[in-house]
């Protein structure tokens, strides 16, 4: 039952190559139609993110050359340009790879949770495209169970290891319920956008975005249902903010001690948290001298991040142990399918034998033969035919001298040691 995981990721391929092999959402259904039309492809799921493009598939044969050729053809890229960056795992390694990817163990940021959501979406799209049947369905269901176990039983996602995530986690430590907090974000770059996404995940209802140009801020306003202001308007809004997170490219501080003093007075000294993740700093260091002010710099966050990286490495080792056990469980299920097929065939053969003998017996009765004789002959022939192959197997096994196999065969036939 050949299972494969093939593709490229941030570890094996440049951004330029990953862009060429990425599947845009509007082309995915066409891609599935073409992929599933390949003679050897039984089932397939395409996972395409900014950091990886992978195909998880169930094939008729024991190599994935046809899928690789299709991938090159679909994206119009020459084979020799893709192969050096391509990995192709089969069976145990393929199962392990999907489990590790879903748990964030193969991500650029160790343990990041977004990849699981992306895999779930990819699986849903594959089902929509008729790319999923029994084997891949079970594979991915098992994958989601593994990822849930890893998240529940380890601390893989509990410790922030990105500046943006660390900033939000720090805010949550100081203001335990962020859903009651007002947040001012200063800047509109990638880091602030990521901070905004994490804040939304924590149900922060009131976000204001301050930026030098309103046009860039407006893009985030729509994304986060926020309010936009210019940097010059910050003094008028600062007192309303409980949490201020700043990340701009300004060469000079944007917030000074005097501005914060006035805001504190207007707030009647209710605490304020300032997180400055800009270099050079956006907030004057003297702000930390004020009472009821918590000021953290990017260096403070880096210290937290380094500690958390070590904690995640420990959690990753625990996750690998869980994954190893789950691989064994899934492979056992796959192996059990072989028995299911054998049982089905054995039953079909037995039923066919029964039907043939019944038809002969019925014909004999219609020809006027004695019912008792017909039944005796039916029972005799049925018994002989049913025990014929097991008897041959017992004889051959006994002659081979393989006692373990003989015991196994006897147990399968329901024979006790005394028989």
Swiss-Prot record:
Homodimer. It is an enzyme of class 1 (oxidoreductase). It comes from Psychromonas ingrahamii (strain DSM 17664 / CCUG 51855 / 37). It comes from the Bacteria. NADP(+) binds at residues 187-192. The record marks 97 as: Important for activity. Substrate binds at residues 49-52, 107, 112-114, 118. Possesses an unusual extended V-shaped dimeric structure with each monomer consisting of three distinct domains arranged along a curved 'spinal' alpha-helix. The N-terminal catalytic domain specifically recognizes the glutamate moiety of the substrate. The second domain is the NADPH-binding domain, and the third C-terminal domain is responsible for dimerization. Pathway: Porphyrin-containing compound metabolism; protoporphyrin-IX biosynthesis; 5-aminolevulinate from L-glutamyl-tRNA(Glu): step 1/2. Catalyzes the NADPH-dependent reduction of glutamyl-tRNA(Glu) to glutamate 1-semialdehyde (GSA). PROSITE patterns: GLUTR. This is Glutamyl-tRNA reductase. Pfam families: GlutR_dimer, GlutR_N, Shikimate_DH. It catalyses: (S)-4-amino-5-oxopentanoate + tRNA(Glu) + NADP(+) = L-glutamyl-tRNA(Glu) + NADPH + H(+). The keyword Oxidoreductase applies. The active site is at residue 50. During catalysis, the active site Cys acts as a nucleophile attacking the alpha-carbonyl group of tRNA-bound glutamate with the formation of a thioester intermediate between enzyme and glutamate, and the concomitant release of tRNA(Glu). The thioester intermediate is finally reduced by direct hydride transfer from NADPH, to form the product GSA. Belongs to the glutamyl-tRNA reductase family. Its EC number is 1.2.1.70. Keywords: NADP, Oxidoreductase, Porphyrin biosynthesis. One of its GO terms (molecular function) is glutamyl-tRNA reductase activity.
